[in-house]
Every structure is written in C-alpha cells, then in structure tokens.
Amino acid sequence: VSIEKKSIEVGSLEWFYLQEKPEKPADYPPVLFLHGIPSLSHSWSAIIPELASQGFWAIAPDWIGHGRSAKPDKRDFAYTPEAFIEALDAFLEALQIERFSLVVQGFLGSVGLQYAFAHPDRIERLAILNTPLSTNAKLPFKMQQMSWPLLGDMMTQDPLLVDRLLEGGSRFVVPDKDLNVYRGPYLATSDSGRSLLMTLKNLQMPSAMAQIESGLSGWEQPTQILWGVLDPWLPLEDAKAAAKSMANVEFVELPEAAHYPQEHWSGEISESLLTFLRRR
C-alpha cells in the first residue's frame, strides 16, 4: 500500500490531503498530522507509511491556503486561527473522524493545538514537534517581513522563500526533490503567496500563545513533545517550561534536529511516535 493523494470538497473549500490506510487495521484511532509554515502535508510523507504499517490510518492535509488545498480570497476566508479551526472541524466531519490522535509542528501547527484545547474530548493522544508553546514565542523575523506591506507582497511571491525558511529553520540542506514539492504551489499561482501573507498577518500570535499556554497547563491527555534542540526560532528552555506545566507528558530531545525535525529525522520520530501511540 502506498500513500494516496486525495482531495475532498468541504462546503466551498477543497482540501488536499495525503493518507494511508493500514492493510491490517489495528484498534487505534486515526492519526492526523498538521504542518507548519512553509511546510506542507509532504513533510509527513516519510512518517505516514511507518504508522500505516503498524495498523494506523494516517492523514495529513495541506492547510487551507497552502499547498494543493483551496486558496480562497481574504473576503471569503479570514485566515485567522478561528477560521482555520472551523475549516479543520468541517474537514474532520467530512472524513467522519470523531476521535483521533493529533501530531502538530510549527507556526500554524499551533492552530492544531488551539483546536485540541477547544475539543479535548476528541483527542486521544497529542504529539508536538517544534511548535510555539509560550508567550515568549515570536514569528521568526523572515516570516514577520513576509507579512509587511509591499515587502511582504514581494517576498511571498518568490518561490525561493521556501528554501530560505526550510533550510534556515532546519539548519540542513533540504533535498531538491522535496523543495520542488514545497515550491510547486508558488510557481503554479500567485494565490499561494497571497494566502501565505494573509496567514502570517492573521496568526494573532500574542493571543494565540496566551491561549496555548493556559491550554497546556490544563491538558490531561497523554502528550509527547519531540523537540529539535537546535531550533533557531523556538528555544529548548521554552519547550521544557511548557512541559513542566503539563500533567501527562514525556519529552524527547532530538539533539541534532532543529525547527523542522521531520524533514531529516523521520526515522527517529516515527519510532518515538509509534511507541507513544501504541501505549494503552
């Protein structure tokens, strides 16, 4: 079985997603993977088969406005955390997913956490890879510039923004075959850059982070934090402080990884995730 590329029309929005259903389904809830900026569902493509081979149905969408999902005009979609949460809720309903385990990474993966704290009864287990978790977290300067008037319009139309962010954030060269997937949407349509700009402009970091900080401290579902220690944007201390505030958490340090750990350390991450997700 290999990864399927699927799309589904939900209301007026088309979602693109990757999924793999297991040949021998085990008695586990599905696992939903949410990407950050400027990653896509593709960033999970080495991990999905590992989970499917162990009986999990694994699903990774491109967020609305990103990758191969719809890129609505800002008049039709607000690009705020609330708008993303509402769209995600409708996507899950369309796939008839009620309870699931959630894996998030990055800026925008953070919206997945906001979703989880609003719907704790739907989350079986939570795994967090390098995602902003504290009110100290700021958008990286390069991403901030992308949301500025004029400069942002220019920067977000340059497909090489992908290379700069992914390689700057992961501190490693990202293979061309992967960069081609990430650049593709920006080469295909100027809507991709516009949607990215709107997303960055509307992340509402201060209020989102306050929400996430308080959400984590009241969170009781089993959680695994997998942290690329060399992240240039999100310090290890902040992640550890967040973990300290939580009831039921294990912390896994990935000593050589940085902001996008799943790009280069998918083997270690799959192994950790499987141990965690299979626990009863």
Where are these regions (language model features)?
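A short loop-to-beta-strand scaffold at the N-terminal edge of the catalytic core in hydrolase folds
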Residues: 11-21
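Active-site loop/oxyanion-hole signature of alpha/beta-hydrolase fold enzymes
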Residues: 19-21, 57-104, 271
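Conserved HGGG/HGGXW glycine-rich cap/lid loop of the alpha/beta-hydrolase fold
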Residues: 20-68
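Glycine-rich nucleophile elbow surrounding the catalytic serine of serine-hydrolase chemistry
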Residues: 105-114
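Flexible "cap/lid" loop of the alpha/beta hydrolase fold
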Residues: 113, 117, 124-156
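Helix-loop "lid/cap" segments that line or gate small-molecule binding pockets
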Residues: 160-174, 181-187, 199-204
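Conserved serine/cysteine hydrolase catalytic core
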Residues: 192-244, 253
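Catalytic active-site module of serine/aspartate enzymes centered on a nucleophile-bearing elbow/loop
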Residues: 249-280
